Amino acid sequence: MGTRRRRPREDLTSPVSMNILAGGLDTGEEDQATSLPARISRYGRAKERAVAMRDYLIDHTAGLRVVLASNPHNIAVEQAAKVAVQAAGNLDGCGNYLHFRHYYTVDQVLLHAACFCKQHLICPLCAIRRGSKTLEAYLSRFQVIRQKWPELSEYLLTLTVKDGPDLPERWGHLDRSFKVLKDRRRYFLAGNRGAPWTEFAKVKGAVGSYEVKRGKGSGLWHPHVHMVGLCETAIDPISIKREWEGITGDSFMIDVRPFDRDQEPAQGFMEVFKYAVKFGDLSLADNWEVAKFLRGSRLLFSLGEFRGVKVPDKLTDEPLDELPYFDLFYRYFAGSGYSIAAPERQAGRGVP
């Protein structure tokens, strides 16, 4: 085995360098053998960011223990330290080895096995895999909807609220406001007496996600909603902006745009399902603060024709049964990323 070359060390604690990592999710095109090197490189960057988060949590825990030394009965600090230690330990064991199978008769390379921490808000590797599984599931439903309702057009919608310094307050404001908009749609479509018209009733089905970042210029918390909506009639931007401002009382920023006809629909859906990867755009400290706050929250939602889609919990790929394959094992090395394991661990196996 050749000598591993160390990459120039980059600061993966910064949002700028993290943008390079968050370039996309796995798609069917990346299953091709020729795409494996790029895929491995991206996984390596994801693991490197996870290691940076692990190290941050270790340092963060050390600081909390200093506080506990002077006040050993501070239950809140003790609990915060336990949560950080557990998260760091899970990150440490995530993605150290990747086991791929190359189904050479169809030239596909699939991720067969790996150890995942499933902390997708702080682990970009798990975020990539989770987002990819979600993308696959909803694209499958989208194809069914398109056959059933060929007259529907796809739109990207973004709902925002005014930036603010208090994350829980801003998040709650967005969540309550969006619930009002969804309720208006539901009441109108149900034919409830007195239910007013809403532009959102034009949406036959939608799937979307919540995101949080720092606002450009303000540096304050900027929660927002991204969604793909399917409509027979185009949403009037002016009307829905007016409605949204009336609901929120402080925000009128809504972006409504049709899918680019020169791109595959998967590109539009990808903007929604990259939500977990995008948390890596935050600094490590902000990333951890957001992850703690959103722990247990449902960040993905669906309505109408997209309701009921099941996303598998398993983050590996489905095997191609009865096809022959070669096994490929990769190990992560700090500073150089993933390298293929020693030849003796790559014995070809499969169905004769």
Show where each model-derived region lies.
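Cys/His-coordinated zinc-finger cores
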Residues: M227
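Right-hand nucleic-acid polymerase module
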Residues: M1-W221, C231-P352
